Amino acid sequence: MLKIGSHVSMSGKEMLLAASKEAVSYGANTFMIYTGAPQNTRRKPIEELNIDKGRAHMKEHGIDEIVVHAPYIINIGNTTNADTFSLGVSFLRSEIERTEAIGAKQLVLHPGAHVGAGIEAGIEKIIEGLNEVITTDQQVQIALETMAGKGSECGSRFEELAKIIDGVTHNDKLSVCFDTCHTHDAGYDIVHDFDGVLDEFDRIIGLDRLKVLHINDSKNACGSRKDRHENIGFGHIGFDALNYIVHHPQLMHVPKILETPYVGEKASAKPPYKFEIAMLRAQQFDPNVREKIVE
């Protein structure tokens, strides 16, 4: 069965219940949340996340697997600022606790940026951070995200992610989140040779570690190292390639999460997810979908 959903908001008093309601309104059977704003460390206590009602609503609507995304501000690849590194370590620990409390198994993490020290130094720092964070008894896997390679990001090559995984002691607690936009922007030809890219991933990392897919089109050409998401079918990856990935027989069990941009003028922009999910379920591109989203 196809597991497809999107990023949804966990906010207000309903929190997880609100997130589940939003996902259901899009026709989703999985979803991804941040436990608070992605750009800061302000978080409500676990008891205010409305977990029981949220889980009950999920069960009622056949949602059994969800994903949590760690905030962008975590950077355990920072070799120059000890405070940034230690904040990343402590906050990642608390995010694991929150993810476990919510009942999710995958916590997506941007591996980190080396801020000028070089990829090797960044990778060593990320390994150090993950070794500090991970415990043998945690239920959650940290899903390292494939990155576009903009700025000083680590993790845009499969070899870099493999090196991180190999360096972590309890690496059974690590998985990978494959982002289509990022991987395309990093230079992998997922448009014309997705099977070849998947084989390369399997050879270098292992397909058994691929636990989350971020399904995004890209505003930029392959190898641009930009990381700007586009709506499904309107970018350089295109509908056919993304549809092929979403329905790939080797990836049917993996939750697919859309993180595409809202459509329309900023103040009144509308989420595209209901329409994009429907297109991908039907395996049929609608060139007029953006007009329908803003109607």
UniProtKB/Swiss-Prot annotation:
Enzyme class: hydrolase
Coiled coil: none
Residues holding Zn(2+) 3: H182, D227, H229
Any single GO BP term: base-excision repair
Alphabetical keyword list: DNA damage, DNA repair, Endonuclease, Hydrolase, Metal-binding, Nuclease, Zinc
Function (record text): Endonuclease IV plays a role in DNA repair. It cleaves phosphodiester bonds at apurinic or apyrimidinic (AP) sites, generating a 3'-hydroxyl group and a 5'-terminal sugar phosphate.
Name of this protein: Probable endonuclease 4
Gene name in the database record: nfo
